[in-house]
UniProtKB/Swiss-Prot annotation:
Biological role stated in the UniProt entry: Cleaves the propeptides of type I and II collagen prior to fibril assembly. Does not act on type III collagen. Cleaves lysyl oxidase LOX at a site downstream of its propeptide cleavage site to produce a short LOX form with reduced collagen-binding activity.
Residue spans of biased composition, Pro residues class: 214-223
Bound cofactor: record note: Binds 1 zinc ion per subunit.
Official protein name in the record: A disintegrin and metalloproteinase with thrombospondin motifs 2
Residue ranges the record assigns to the propeptide: 29-260
Length: 1213
């Protein structure tokens, strides 16, 4: 079926035919019938998360249940050894640094700050996503296959603290954090900025990208809904089952699973996930498995949404990653139906014959990045195909994590769900983000299953018996510690080289455990090896097994042993006596030590705490500066001693290594060592500290990992309400060539800015008032170059551009400074300054104190938001507005833009129960037309819910349970009054003798539409008389015909003659007007049929225009288009026979009434059409095109006339 034109050509979900061609001979599968139809595509759900979304960088940290920092390591792999660490992650309960053991239930906790919001994530393992015994299979180009256990131990679900019922989280921590965080009004994507950097997490944490998706745009309205979704009928399923034959019987019988059934409320979709090479190449072989697990974790979370109304788990039992060649053979570019057919057949061939096999799947999901359909097509699937051996499959275009909605949508089709708004009444839920919308508009913060999806699922779900078994209820055998215990050397040879290969036995001089040598029985002396030993545990001799390349007796002490942490040591001494230091404790992985390939301990081997946070007596001391000064006498650079000053490296990763700057040369030199533990990481952050070469985030509250910060004037967690802005301008005139004192800046000043008002040749100078040392431009040591430098424990930025100087620092100043000017000439000097300071530290003239917008205004409670529900228990939040402190007047919120907005307070509201909404209808509006065929009446139909305060409100129509009253109806559907319109008379039907003429007569309205005419209809046919025809002979091959009616009495009803009591209503047939038939008036049935012609009231020659009056009664234009003979009173039979001559050719008139005619008492008998030979000369007949109106209601007569006309040559009849 071609897609509809216009906007619908975007392929919302076109119904396309799946034409299953015969398979290749090796498949041994009969093709399903061509009538099987599949549901097609869905539009993309907005592209990858980054498109159209806000994004920030964030560094999540791992915490305990109370939100206290445990480690910067967030990846499960980081502390372990690859796959082995992942496999054992859930068993490890004491591997967390900081003494915070992992929750016994395997729960994890993370802190994350996104867009100004602090989130505390509480996660639990998603233990029901990957089935026990599940595998991942890599298929190579040469046909070789590598199978590995599928491990899902790094998949988690959970919620956000403080929003347990209004949030959901689905993350993986295989390699950083990746997945979704969904809250009431927002949703976030998170993924590592760069993959494969888990080894760097322990140093300074792992940088992640967090996307915030904007609201999904409202779709354009569709003028007419189109039912584009058509599923497979039951007949098609039956025919497909018959086509599968014996194979089908075997599969159907095998559905009686013997595993323990799940509870009646639980359904498990065991999934085979097929992935083609385009997906593998895009994500990379080393990352694709983690990505697939994260994607399916999100799909599983979508099916856990309570709006679905059912408990459905999506369980992975097998992943197959296809080779490039196989991927190209399955997907046909631009042909979605053939591509889906190929995928479904491929999935069928992957099915395990034993239903008890742990890889037996109920449903196949295939992911590709190839364009299998038109642009924009994202998915393709059958409807109601679940549990079917061939049709339980979907084809999906993979395009990032948002493809989870495409997978959920297409699997919904297989479960029996239709598109919302197409064939159901849920089109109004499309814009709300319903999963089954024709264009997928669901977003991670606003998705739901519509009420129609819930109803359609409940209609079919109980019939899907394959979803009843529980894959987690097996008593699965424990995996052997040594894999070779289950595979002999012969089996390993077959794996390596193919069927028939066995261990080489031609030579017995080598140790079989050194290298695996294989040969084929056809050539036993030709041995091959892949230069690798057999698997550990492979039997090599009676009672002996291969281990580490040796054939030995296996004893418990040589088997693999995993390591475990020992006890913590006591905390050591503090690294500093004041100014906040750190102290450590350690532990060893010796309880027991890992051995024989066992996994090492996960987590950090040390833990630390802050100590001695009190300020040092010397407030001007700079711990980093002291460390540089210690090397003045010991560290020579360029064979010269230097005075070393502190330097902050531009690279954040190097800031916990000691770099110093030469006071003499300005060179920056690495001291080849780390700074002491407890040194501030940066002069821009007064609290974060270096610990063993790593910068550890510390909040202003002294808590490790805390995000709490100071406001602009140093109040921890403050809102700038106690900040004052001080500014001023000082102007001096040089009177001598000596320092000119301008002003002083007090200790505690922050965000200091000093600059020249005009361009001058003077030099700015700054001196520490307490020590008397210059920190910028001494008189005998001027440096006019722009630069950054560290002095008095803070970083300064000095700029000299076009002889206009500027000096600024974030601060805070630990002591008072004096600002001076070194004059050059006698030009007046003007300096301006501006800084912020806490109001309690203010000791300046009030004239210099200013209050900016951030100080003069504050956020204030404005009102409570409307309750989210009018009944049944809703919630409302505080709404804040910007208020001016001076007069408490509410102003525009822009004045408070620099202030942190308080968090909204939530409270419950409207707890009373809701009443059932009912349908309320309005009055019918006047009809749109007074007559015709388009008249309509409309009225309003609303779903109204009575409220507790004797008011009502309009609610969504889905809340009203009863049948919705009609809102439109037809009215005044009758023909409009018209007038008869007659056309011109046609040419006489003969050239001599008596013939007929016709003309069209139509009843039309003023606007030329069909109408109803109440006046008598003008005649449409009349007799024309021309000169008598000559009686000479004619061509015997030419024949004319006359119709002869033969009737016999009806034995059940006596013949009734026409009497005066039976008033003649006019002729009932067009043949009555032909004079040659007048001889049949003696027959009662014919006399009654042609009562007017057989009993003329006056001479026809005296009739006006020589015509015959039409029968009385009203005739409308509908008669013209539906001409017919009177009722079925005559049967016909063609039989040529001689008869009386015809004076006019047989012609069907168009004046046929539509009124019902009373039946006669005559029983139909065949009548005959007799040939009239050599009586009418051929030039007498005028050939003409049969009228469009030549029809009869008597089907037998019409068929007879048509048959005669076909037999004769054109122009003869």
């Amino acid at each position: 079926m071609d897609p509809p034109a216009g906007a619908a050509r975007r392929l919302l979900c076109p119904a396309l035919l799946l034409l299953l061609l015969p398979p290749p001979p090796l498949l041994l599968l009969p093709p399903p019938p061509a009538s099987v139809r599949l549901v097609a595509a869905t539009e993309p759900p907005g592209g990858p998360p980054g498109q159209g979304a806000e994004r920030i960088l964030a560094v999540p940290v791992r915490t305990d249940a109370q939100g206290r920092l445990v480690s910067h390591v967030v990846s499960l792999e980081t502390a372990g050894a690859g796959v082995r660490a992942r496999r054992a992650a859930l068993d490890q309960t004491s591997g967390l640094p900081g003494g915070a053991a992992q929750d016994p239930g395997g729960r994890l906790f993370y802190n994350l700050t996104v867009f100004g919001r602090d989130l505390h994530l509480r996660l639990r393992p998603n233990a029901r996503l990957v089935a026990p015994g599940a595998t991942v299979e890599w298929q190579g180009e040469t046909g070789d296959t590598r199978v590995e256990p599928l491990l899902g131990s790094c998949l988690y679900v959970g919620d956000v603290a403080d929003l347990p019922k209004a949030s959901s989280v689905a993350l993986s921590n295989c390699d950083g954090l990746a997945g979704l965080i969904r809250m009431e009004e927002e949703e976030f994507f998170i993924e590592p900025l760069e993959k494969g950097q888990t080894d760097q997490e322990a140093e300074q944490g792992r940088v992640h990208v967090v996307y915030r998706r904007p609201p999904t745009p409202k779709p354009p309205p569709v003028s007419e809904p189109q039912a584009l979704d058509t599923g497979v009928s039951q007949g098609n399923l039956d025919s497909l089952s018959r086509a599968l034959g014996v194979l089908e019987e075997r599969i159907n019988s095998s559905r009686r699973r013997v595993r323990r059934h799940a509870t009646d409320d639980d359904y498990n979709i065991e999934v085979l996930l097929g992935v083609d090479d385009s997906v593998v190449q895009f994500h990379g072989k080393e990352h694709v498995q983690k990505y697939l697990l994260t994607l399916m974790n999100i799909v599983n979370e979508i099916y856990h949404d309570e709006s679905l109304g059912a408990h459905i788990n999506v369980v992975l039992v097998r992943i197959i990653l296809l080779s490039h060649a196989k991927s190209m053979s399955l997907i046909e570019i631009g042909n979605p139906s053939q591509s889906l057919e190929n995928v479904c057949r491929w999935a069928y061939l992957q099915q395990k014959p034993d239903t008890d096999h742990d890889e037996y799947h109920d449903h196949a999901i295939f992911l590709t990045r190839q364009d299998f359909g038109p642009s924009g097509m994202q998915g393709y699937a059958p409807v109601t195909g679940m549990c079917h051996p061939v049709r339980s499959c979907t084809l999906n275009h993979e395009d990032g994590f948002s493809s989870a909605f495409v997978v959920a949508h297409e699997t919904g089709h297989v479960l029996g769900m239709e598109h919302d708004g197409q064939g159901n009444r849920c089109g109004d839920e499309v814009r709300l983000g319903s999963i089954m919308a024709p264009l997928v508009q669901a977003a991670f913060h606003r998705f739901h299953w519509s009420r129609c999806s819930q109803q359609e699922l409940s209609r079919y779900l109980h019939s899907y018996d394959c979803l009843r078994d529980d894959p987690f209820a097996h008593d699965w055998p424990a995996l052997p510690q040594l894999p070779g215990l289950h595979y002999s050397m012969n089996e390993q040879c077959r794996f390596d080289f193919g069927l028939g290969y066995m261990m080489c036995t031609a030579f017995r001089t080598f140790d079989p455990c050194k290298q695996l040598w294989c040969s084929h029985p056809d050539n036993p002396y030709f041995c091959k090896t892949k230069k690798g030993p057999p698997l550990d545990g492979t039997m090599c001799a009676p009672g002996k097994h291969c281990f580490k390349g040796h054939c030995i007796w296996l004893t418990p002490d040589i088997l693999k042993r995993d390591g475990n942490w020992g006890a913590w040591t006591p905390f050591g001494s503090c690294s500093r006596t004041c100014g906040t230091g750190v102290k450590f404790r350690t532990r060893q992985c010796d309880n027991p030590h890992p051995a024989n390939g066992g996994r090492t301990c996960s987590g950090l081997a040390y833990d630390f705490q802050l100590c001695n946070p009190q300020d040092c007596p010397n407030s001007l001391a700079d711990f980093r500066e002291e460390q540089c000064q210690q090397w003045d006498l010991y560290f020579e650079h360029g064979d010269v001693q230097h005075h070393w000053l502190p330097h902050e490296h531009r690279d954040a990763k190097e800031r916990c290594h000691l770099y110093c700057e030469s006071k003499e040369t300005g060179e920056v030199v690495s001291m080849k060592r780390m700074v002491h533990d407890g040194t501030r990481c940066s002069y821009k952050d007064a609290f974060s500290l270096c610990v063993r070469g790593d910068c550890r985030k510390v909040g202003c509250d002294g808590v490790i990992g805390s995000r709490k910060q100071e406001d602009k004037c140093g109040v921890c967690g403050g809102d700038n309400t106690h900040c004052k802005v001080v500014k001023g301008t000082f102007t001096r005139s040089p009177r001598k060539q000596d320092y000119i004192k301008m002003f002083e800046i007090p200790a505690g000043a922050r965000h200091l800015l000093i600059q020249e008002a005009d361009t001058t040749s003077h030099h700015l100078s700054v001196k520490n008032l307490e020590t008397g040392k210059f920190i910028l431009n001494e008189e005998n040591h001027l440096d006019p170059n722009s630069r950054s430098f560290i002095a008095m424990g803070v970083e300064w930025e000095y700029r000299n551009e076009d002889e206009r100087e500027t000096l600024q620092t974030i601060g805070p100043l630990h002591g008072t400074i004096t600002v001076l000017v070194i004059p050059e000439g006698d030009t007046r000097i003007s300096l301006t300054y501006k800084y912020m300071i806490h109001e309690d530290s203010l000791n300046v003239d009030d004239n210099n104190v200013l209050e900016d917008d951030a100080v003069r205004h504050e956020w204030a409670l404005k009102k409570w938001s409307p309750c989210s529900k009018p009944c049944g228990g809703g919630s409302q939040f505080t709404k804040y507005g910007c208020r001016r402190r001076l007069d408490s007047k509410m102003v525009h919120r822009a004045f408070c833009s620099a202030l942190a907005k308080p968090k909204a307070i939530r409270r419950a509201c409207n707890p009373q129960e809701c009443s059932q909404p009912v349908w309320v209808t309005g009055e019918w509006e006047p009809c749109t037309q007074s007559c015709g065929r388009t008249g309509m009446q409309v009225r309003s139909v609303r779903c109204i819910q009575p409220l507790h305060n004797n008011t009502t409100r309009s609610v969504h129509t889905k809340h009203c349970n009863d049948h919705r009253p009609e809102s439109r109806r037809a009215c005044n559907r009758e023909l409009c009054p018209g007038r008869w319109r007659a056309g011109s008379w046609s040419q006489c039907s003969v050239t001599c003798g008596n013939g007929t003429q016709e003309r069209p007569v139509l009843c039309r309205t003023a606007d030329d539409n069909f109408g109803v005419c109440r006046e008598e209809r003008p005649e449409t046919a009349r007799i024309c008389r021309l000169a008598p025809c000559p009686r000479n002979g004619s061509d015997p091959s030419k024949k004319s015909y006359v119709v002869q009616w033969l009737s016999r009495p009806d034995p059940d009803s006596p013949i009734q003659k026409i009497s005066s009591k039976d008033q003649c209503q006019g002729d009932k047939s067009m043949f009555c007007r032909m004079e040659v038939l007048s001889r049949y008036c003696s027959i009662p049935s014919y006399n009654k049929l042609c009562c007017k012609s057989c009993n003329p009231p006056r001479n026809l020659s005296n009739t006006e225009d020589g015509g015959v009056e039409p029968p009385p009664g009203k005739h409308n234009d509908i008669d013209v288009f539906m001409p017919t003979l009177p009722g079925p009173t005559v049967a016909t039979q063609v039989q040529p026979s001689p008869g009386p001559p015809l004076e006019a050719p047989l012609n069907v008139s168009s004046t046929n009434a539509t009124e019902d005619h009373p039946e006669t008492n005559a029983v139909d008998v065949p009548y005959k059409i007799h040939g009239v030979d050599e009586e009418v000369p051929s030039p007498n007949l005028i050939p003409r095109r049969p009228s469009l109106y030549v029809k009869t209601r008597n089907q037998r007569i019409q068929e007879l006339i048509n048959a005669v006309q076909r037999k004769e040559k054109p122009g003869k009849f």
